[in-house]
Amino acid sequence: MSQQVIIFDTTLRDGEQALQASLSAKEKLQIALALERMGVDVMEVGFPVSSPGDFESVQTIARQVKNSRVCALARCVEKDIDVAAESLKVAEAFRIHTFIATSPMHIATKLRSTLDEVIERAIYMVKRARNYTDDVEFSCEDAGRTPIADLARVVEAAINAGATTINIPDTVGYTMPFEFAGIISGLYERVPNIDKAIISVHTHDDLGLAVGNSLAAVHAGARQVEGAMNGIGERAGNCSLEEVIMAIKVRKDILNVHTAINHQEIWRTSQLVSQICNMPIPANKAIVGSGAFAHSSGIHQDGVLKNRENYEIMTPESIGLNQIQLNLTSRSGRAAVKHRMDEMGYKESEYNLDNLYDAFLKLADKKGQVFDYDLEALAFIGKQQEEPEHFRLDYFSVQSGSNDIATAAVKLACGEEVKAEAANGNGPVDAVYQAINRITDYNVELVKYSLTAKGHGKDALGQVDIVANYNGRRFHGVGLATDIVESSAKAMVHVLNNIWRAAEVEKELQRKAQHNENNKETV
């Protein structure tokens, strides 16, 4: 049995289901490229049959990612598998992941079928997927509540049909680690052809046991772990990949396995996913939380100063968190900024140096010194705003006080035209948003607003993340500035541009569909 555990990331498929606003194709690609840098073996990037937008996103990622295997999800339905294959065919290497429920409850109440019919359908669909690729993963949905004898029958049939990976999900986060390990051991005992496939696990955190269950399964013989960065996902979330990866590294003495992950990219990838998905990481989150390497107890601090291993089982540097930070000033040149970005692990393709340096100078003039966390925030915002903008914040001014009604004046560039409006509101941010709504007539409804300090002290950058509702869809926006009202205004303008871009994408998809329809009629 191989001692390498395959890391299967589902941040962009299962993880995205937890988000209040769907990610754009550009945001998904940004995360996919970060996952590729981190070295995930397989990335599941969408459910192509669900929408034209998801199909396009999967296809875009499949075209760009070269070093990780790209995977798409498909139910045991002919159209699902055919559409998944179509979206993936541009990839260097791809996998089709198909699934069907196997527990008595799901078979009876959801599928209204029988186990024999489920097995027959699984065989047919695995064979269909094999027509497109020799890398087919089959999942037994709700395997955690499936009797082991039934599960063994399904697994044996799927392997005989050509499945190369068999995934055992604890779909509802129900099992305990010793139970889950028993399921894996039971399959090795009962399935005669099990050596012809890799056994995978996919766990959920409803009882807080997702990581524990995955590690117990690895100890019992599973050689693929599925999960999401930061543990994002439906309900209580998925297995946190960064936790499993570091547990395998730190406790190699017990597990005796390894991964192909570049551990130095863990922290940066985690931060990127948090920012793009607008899901802050709890301070006490294992591995990547801001408190993961903090020591407040005097006894602990003394022990760490004498020897870090007294209270640290891994170092911040082991996940790419460099604690030595260089500060730059307005006198620092472009070369110094580029050198620092290189030292932090950024490639030139990940940011626009001209735009970054311009933003750096403006910030340095305001706050004097610019630190690593400032540069990272500027690079992230710059990447988010690289796409063509229809709306641009030209000017804003607010007046408010303890006894005054907040008033805002806003100038907004809308294409080639600059429009201005003023409005009152319940505070300066609301006044700015009311003025912007008057200018655009979009009538955007604010659903969520959050403010995060990027840095330390009174001159820290403030990042505002908002989720807004427009025509039944939710859109995410982000803004960054030393002034909170300015950050808020930029976040709303980002939302407007995302709405505008979504409309443009929809027009393009309709144009392509009409073009294809016309070609069919011609034929």
Swiss-Prot record:
GO terms for cellular component: cytosol. Its EC number is 2.3.3.13. Residues 392-523 are annotated as: Regulatory domain. One of its GO terms (biological process) is L-leucine biosynthetic process. The keyword Amino-acid biosynthesis applies. Pathway: Amino-acid biosynthesis; L-leucine biosynthesis; L-leucine from 3-methyl-2-oxobutanoate: step 1/4. Mn(2+) binds at D14, H202, H204, N238. Keywords: Amino-acid biosynthesis, Branched-chain amino acid biosynthesis, Cytoplasm, Leucine biosynthesis, Manganese, Metal-binding, Transferase. Residues 5-267 form the Pyruvate carboxyltransferase domain. Its cofactor is Mn(2+). One of its GO terms (molecular function) is acetyl-CoA C-acetyltransferase activity. Disulfide bonds: none annotated. It catalyses: 3-methyl-2-oxobutanoate + acetyl-CoA + H2O = (2S)-2-isopropylmalate + CoA + H(+). It comes from the Bacteria. It is found in: Cytoplasm. Belongs to the alpha-IPM synthase/homocitrate synthase family. LeuA type 1 subfamily. Catalyzes the condensation of the acetyl group of acetyl-CoA with 3-methyl-2-oxobutanoate (2-ketoisovalerate) to form 3-carboxy-3-hydroxy-4-methylpentanoate (2-isopropylmalate). Homodimer. This is 2-isopropylmalate synthase. It comes from Escherichia coli (strain SMS-3-5 / SECEC).
